[in-house]
């Protein structure tokens, strides 16, 4: 689901990339929004909605939170757009937020999962990070069954309201 696009096909604000697998593989306990340090061509490529964060993860390096293994392909429109597509990218958070999340990761054995990359109303790129507890296989099956039941229930409610 992409955000609002301009005439040039670029996303002005809204969703640029989503990690649906992250919400399935982890029980998300808490979320926060963090800024991300990007170069110009990376932002343009991100605005085209070409990024992938399915295999991405966030971790601590030198007291800061970094996003690893996210894929932002090179922007084809420019000549000087040479950058590493899978380079680690620094996330911008307050010190207290960093301490809170790193403490939770070390205590509870949780993980920092990037859930999506989006552009806010001001056009700034943001990453939604979730503090996730890993799910076991039976938990995943339960989540699938619950989701299917909600879908079937909504379908039954819709169909029962029709007059034949």
From Swiss-Prot:
| Record's keyword terms, sorted | Cytoplasm, RNA-binding
Q: Which domain of life is it from?
A: Bacteria
What sections of the protein cross the membrane? none
SUPFAM superfamilies associated with the record? Small protein B (SmpB)
Kindly list the places in or outside the cell where this protein is found, as annotated in its UniProt entry.
Cytoplasm
Give an example GO cellular component term for this record. cytosol
**What Gene Ontology molecular function terms does this protein carry?**
RNA binding
| GO annotation, biological process | trans-translation
- Role according to the record: Required for rescue of stalled ribosomes mediated by trans-translation. Binds to transfer-messenger RNA (tmRNA), required for stable association of tmRNA with ribosomes. tmRNA and SmpB together mimic tRNA shape, replacing the anticodon stem-loop with SmpB. tmRNA is encoded by the ssrA gene; the 2 termini fold to resemble tRNA(Ala) and it encodes a 'tag peptide', a short internal open reading frame. During trans-translation Ala-aminoacylated tmRNA acts like a tRNA, entering the A-site of stalled ribosomes, displacing the stalled mRNA.
User: What family is it from?
Assistant: Belongs to the SmpB family.
Protein name in UniProt: SsrA-binding protein
* Gene that produces this protein: smpB
């Amino acid at each position: 689901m992409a955000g609002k696009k301009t005439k040039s096909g670029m996303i002005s604000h809204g969703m640029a990339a989503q990690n649906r697998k992250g919400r399935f593989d982890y029980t998300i306990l808490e979320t926060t929004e963090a800024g991300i340090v990007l170069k110009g061509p990376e932002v343009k490529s991100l605005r085209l909605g070409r990024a992938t964060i399915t295999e991405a993860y966030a971790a601590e390096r030198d007291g800061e939170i970094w996003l690893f293994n996210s894929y932002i392909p090179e922007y084809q429109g420019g000549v000087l757009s040479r950058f590493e597509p899978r380079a680690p990218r620094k996330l911008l958070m307050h010190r207290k937020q960093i301490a809170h999340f790193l403490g939770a990761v070390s205590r509870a054995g949780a993980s920092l999962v990037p859930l999506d990359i989006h552009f806010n109303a001001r056009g700034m790129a943001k990453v939604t990070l979730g503090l996730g507890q890993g799910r076991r296989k039976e938990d995943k099956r339960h989540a699938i069954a619950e989701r299917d039941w909600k879908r079937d229930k909504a379908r039954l409610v819709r169909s029962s309201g029709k007059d034949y």
